[in-house]
């Protein structure tokens, strides 16, 4: 990958990782329009690491408070709202871990196509619109509970299907369960930490096992670009949804799905 390709794809990944619009749907477009080949494991390591660092940096105070409360709850047995939230995040991660280890190969083989990505982009865009329209109660993330956390975790596991969008699926589920828009987004972002950490570790292992020559310059550039893009994305996404809701992202998903359908049928 040349420098231009690294920058463009890292920008796309960083900007779309935390928006409910599907990063896989966007990464397929450069391949279709410019004939770019698969990005390779080095790029996957870079963008996973950059996105993880961005969400950890943005929510550093919340994560530190949660981690401190969680470790204290293990030692003392006493639960606070921060420790409960930590346990719910852990619970919500389990479905994605199970599906990821048991069905990743099957999903990559049978669902990683432009037809599937186009369909899921549109279908889950409509579900996001419906969930946002129906959202009424406005719970915060400290009121989730283990049942809601598990349902949101199942939605995250479904997002392993390309085009679904991890943040889109989890935010949709959270809205359906009565969380406010901001709380749904924050819970989704916090959920991304263990998932992104696990993905970064697994992809790094795959890279080391593959024996590929590592392009450290491209790796470093990808981390920096995806970190900056993801950090900015998180900040402005939270501001946008508090004022405009999910409608802009629904419209965008439907338009993107239409473009992908154009590649299929034209």
Swiss-Prot record:
One of its GO terms (molecular function) is undecaprenyl-diphosphatase activity. It comes from Shewanella halifaxensis (strain HAW-EB4). It is an enzyme of class 3 (hydrolase). The lineage of its organism: Bacteria, Pseudomonadati, Pseudomonadota, Gammaproteobacteria, Alteromonadales. It is found in: Cell inner membrane. HAMAP family: Undec_diphosphatase (MF_01006). Belongs to the UppP family. This is Undecaprenyl-diphosphatase. It is a multi-pass membrane protein. Catalyzes the dephosphorylation of undecaprenyl diphosphate (UPP). Confers resistance to bacitracin. It comes from the Bacteria. One of its GO terms (cellular component) is plasma membrane. Its EC number is 3.6.1.27.
């Amino acid at each position: 990958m040349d420098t231009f390709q690294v920058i463009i794809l890292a920008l796309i990944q960083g900007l779309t990782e935390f928006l409910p619009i599907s990063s896989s749907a966007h990464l397929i477009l450069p391949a279709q329009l410019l004939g770019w080949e698969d990005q390779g494991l080095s790029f996957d390591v870079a963008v996973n690491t950059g996105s993880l660092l961005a969400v950890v940096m943005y929510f550093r105070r919340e994560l530190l408070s949660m981690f401190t409360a969680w470790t204290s709850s293990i030692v003392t047995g006493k639960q606070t709202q921060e420790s409960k939230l930590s346990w719910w995040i852990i619970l919500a991660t389990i479905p994605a871990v199970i599906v990821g280890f048991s069905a990743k190969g099957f999903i990559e083989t049978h669902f990683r196509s432009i037809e599937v990505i186009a369909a899921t982009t549109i279908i889950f865009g409509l579900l996001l619109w419906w969930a946002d329209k129906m959202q009424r109660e406005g719970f915060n993330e400290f009121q989730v509970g283990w049942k809601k956390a598990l349902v949101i975790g199942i939605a995250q596991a479904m997002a392993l299907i390309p085009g679904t969008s991890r943040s889109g699926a989890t935010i949709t589920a959270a809205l359906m369960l009565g969380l406010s828009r901001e709380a749904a987004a924050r819970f989704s972002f916090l959920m991304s930490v263990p998932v992104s950490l696990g993905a970064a570790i697994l992809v790094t292992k795959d890279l080391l096992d593959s024996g590929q020559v590592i392009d450290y310059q491209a790796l470093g550039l990808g981390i920096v670009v995806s970190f900056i893009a993801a950090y900015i994305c998180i900040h402005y996404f939270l501001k946008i949804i508090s004022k405009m809701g999910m409608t802009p992202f629904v419209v965008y998903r439907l338009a993107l799905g239409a473009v992908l359908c154009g590649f299929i049928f034209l």
